[in-house]
Amino acid sequence: NKKIHEKDCFNLNPATNVMNPRAEAFLSCGIGSRPSLGYPGDKYEMGLEAIEEIEVLASSLVAEIFCSKFAEIRVPSGAMANLFSFMAVCKSGDTIIGPPASIGGHVTHHNPGCAGLFGLNIIEAPIDKDYYTVDIDQLRELALKERPKLITLGGSLNLFQHPVSAVSSI
C-alpha cells in the first residue's frame, strides 16, 4: 500500500492525511493515512485492495464479538464534517447544488453520501469540461431557477482551482 501511494504514483487526493512521524512509523504499512471512501469492492479510490481485506476481516471479527449481523469499523472523518456542515446550513428536503463525480465531486455531496442520507435534494452542477470545474454561467442560471439552500464545490479531486469567488457571488 505504501509503495503504491508514495513511490509508484503522484497522489492528487487532498484527503490523504499527513501523519505524525511516530504514528506513521507505528503503522509502518501506511494504512492509517489513506482515505478509503466506499465499501469493500466499491471504493472511490484505486489501490486499496489491502485495506479492503482488513476492513472485511475487522468488521467480521467485531460483529462476531458483539453478536451482531454488521459492524462499522471505519473511522468517520471528513464525511462527518460534511454532514455537520449540511446540518448547520440546511434541513431535510432542502436543495443543494454540487459538482458531479465526473469532475471530482465528493461522494458525501451525492445521494449515496451524507447529503442524500440527510434527505437533501441534490442537483449536479453544470460542468466546464475544459477546465475540470463548474460552468459559472450555467450554474448561475440553474441557481436562479432552483433556488438552492447551498452551492458547494466540495470534491475528492482538485486538479485546478475552483471559481470560488464567482460561485460565492451567485
Which stretches of residues belong to each language-model region?
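N-terminal "arm"/small-domain region of PLP-dependent enzymes with the aminotransferase-like
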Residues: 1-42
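Short catalytic-loop micro-motif centered on adjacent basic/acidic residues
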Residues: 11, 70-73, 150-154
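Gly/Ser/Thr-rich loops at beta-strand to alpha-helix junctions
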Residues: 18, 76-80, 103, 156-160
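Conserved N-terminal alpha-helix of the aminotransferase class I/II PLP-enzyme fold
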Residues: 35-80
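Conserved PLP-anchoring active-site segment centered on the Schiff-base-forming lysine
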Residues: 90-106
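PLP-dependent aminotransferase-class I/II
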Residues: 108-153, 158-162
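Catalytic PLP-binding core of fold-type I/II PLP enzymes
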Residues: 161-170
